[in-house]
Curated annotation (Swiss-Prot):
Na(+)/H(+) antiporter that extrudes sodium in exchange for external protons. The keyword Membrane applies. Disulfide bonds: none annotated. One of its GO terms (molecular function) is sodium:proton antiporter activity. The gene is nhaA1. It catalyses: Na(+)(in) + 2 H(+)(out) = Na(+)(out) + 2 H(+)(in). It is found in: Cell inner membrane. InterPro entries: Na/H_antiporter_dom_sf, NhaA. PANTHER family: NA(+)_H(+) ANTIPORTER NHAA (PTHR30341:SF0), SODIUM ION/PROTON ANTIPORTER NHAA-RELATED (PTHR30341). It is a multi-pass membrane protein. This is Na(+)/H(+) antiporter NhaA 1. GO terms for biological process: regulation of pH. GO terms for cellular component: plasma membrane.
Length: 464
């Protein structure tokens, strides 16, 4: 995700910062730096998962599990919708996560690594290998009807955790490898969305499904006629979410569909904006009087407002929304999801039997072995047959490290587990145990491999 931190305006000597503001900034600035680090989202998500595990295995476990199922509803006359807090998080908050996933997918397909076929081949092929092989690995250990439905669980890669780990390595990994991992995870997310839509839907209510199709067409129509107000898309998207909730298709898919219809064209082109800004700045300088407050100068206030409107217009709605939602999703929605879903009560006296369950073994086998073999093997074959080439400054050893990090399947894997084993809490627990164990092992292994590799001088393509 492109989330470069905007530069701040620094007061100059003629307009110094007040003393109290300087002191406040000494406290705030380090916090802002922490929030804007690539590693922070992954660290907070990890902390949330550990908190959930600690609560589920503490004397507070009963209260924690009870809180997950507290009912919360909304009444409007005779109309009522009520769900547990757990369901509101998984069906409601996660729709915003899928909205951001959709924005990222659209941007990558328009101007990112997936926009050019030659560049896109490697992450696409790697992602497909990293989805198909893990599913086969899981199926091989779960051939009975009860557990077979979990085949989609090990297909997912958690981009927040993976990037958090790779960011800890700083300059030890080439930038092209990070780009490859991001593109792979985005294709992986698209695959997970398709799997959820096709294979993890309940009995379909066709009247609501038709209504959803009509609302989707309406969103596309809004895009085609040039409506740029995000509020219009959010309003229709909210109705689409409710319709999907009633249709049997998972409601979070409304987030992806809405994101794909968000306009990706700016109101003004960059040349028009540049010329207009020069004109506004000229008028602003001309209208400035020393030490005059802008509150008293309506002309200057008007120019600033015009400039602000221009800044909004030269950006695409897609850019603005992706930037606006990145931090709420990374620092609130995903940690809340982890707290509500990662809490697994472990009977340590019976640990061997817990981890010896076919679901747990299937998830571990799929994530740790299937992802590694799928991503590495598919990448090697694609390069070997001349379909693509390695990213700049990378070798197959780097791809091996990326495939280890690709085995971290936390968020989306848990989400699919909840869908695969609805009303079967024991099976969900088994799946979560496998996900947590695999993610821990994959994260540590990937870090150690790439850390060691960063200390060596690898030759590009030496392992081909």
């Amino acid at each position: 995700m492109s989330n470069e931190t905007p530069k701040k305006f620094i007061p100059n000597e003629q307009n110094p910062m007040p003393r109290w503001e300087k002191k406040f900034n000494k406290i705030l600035t380090p916090f802002e730096r922490f929030v804007n680090r690539t590693t922070t989202g992954g660290l907070i998500l990890m902390m949330a998962a550990l908190i959930a595990l600690a609560l589920a295995n503490s004397p507070l476990a009963h209260h924690y599990l009870h809180a997950l199922h507290v009912p919360l509803g909304l009444n409007l006359g005779d109309w009522r919708i009520e769900k547990s807090l757990h369901h509101w998080v998984n069906d409601g908050l996660m729709a915003l996560f899928f909205f951001v996933v959709g924005l990222e997918l659209k941007r990558e397909m328009l101007v990112g690594e997936l926009a050019e076929i030659r560049k896109a081949v490697l992450p696409i092929v790697a992602a497909i290998g990293g989805m198909v092989i893990p599913a086969i690995c899981y199926m091989s250990l779960n051939l009975n009807d009860e557990t077979f439905r979990g085949w989609g669980i090990p297909m997912a890669t958690d981009i927040a955790f993976a990037l958090g780990v790779i960011a800890l390595l700083a300059s030890r990994v080439p930038k092209a490898l990070i780009t490859f991992l991001v593109a792979l995870a985005i294709v992986d997310d698209l695959g997970a969305v398709v799997v959820i839509a096709v294979f993890y839907t309940q009995d379909l209510a066709w009247s609501f499904l038709i209504a959803g199709a009509l609302l989707t067409c309406l969103l596309i129509f809004f895009n085609m006629i040039g409506i740029r107000k995000p509020s219009v898309y959010f309003f229709v998207g909210l109705i689409l979410w409710f319709v999907f909730l009633k249709s049997g298709v998972h409601a979070t898919l409304a987030g992806v569909i809405t994101a794909f219809t968000i306009p990706a064209k700016p109101k003004f082109n960059t040349l028009t904006f540049s010329n207009r800004v020069q004109d506004i700045l000229y008028k602003f300088r001309k209208g400035c009087e020393e030490d005059e407050s802008i509150l008293r100068n309506e002309h200057l206030s008007g120019l600033v407002q015009t400039l602000e409107n221009g800044v909004v217009g030269v950006q695409t709605p897609l850019q603005r929304l992706e930037h606006s939602f990145h931090k709420p999703v990374a620092f609130f929605i995903l940690p809340v999801f982890a707290i509500f879903n990662a809490g697994v009560t472990i009977d340590f006296g019976n640990a061997f039997q817990l981890f010896n369950h076919p679901i747990t073994l299937g998830v571990v086998f799929g994530l740790l072995f299937g992802k590694f073999v799928g991503i590495t093997g598919a990448s090697w074959l694609a390069i070997r047959f001349g379909l693509c080439s390695l990213p700049n400054d990378t070798s197959m050893k780097h791809i091996i490290g990326a495939s280890m990090l690709g085995s971290i399947g936390f968020t989306m894997s848990i989400f699919i587990a909840e869908l695969a084993f609805v009303s079967q809490p024991e099976m969900i627990i088994q799946a979560k145990l496998g996900i947590l164990l695999s993610s821990l092992v994959a994260g540590v292994a990937g870090y150690l491999w790439l850390h060691k590799l960063g200390g060596e001088k690898s030759r590009i393509g030496s392992s081909l």
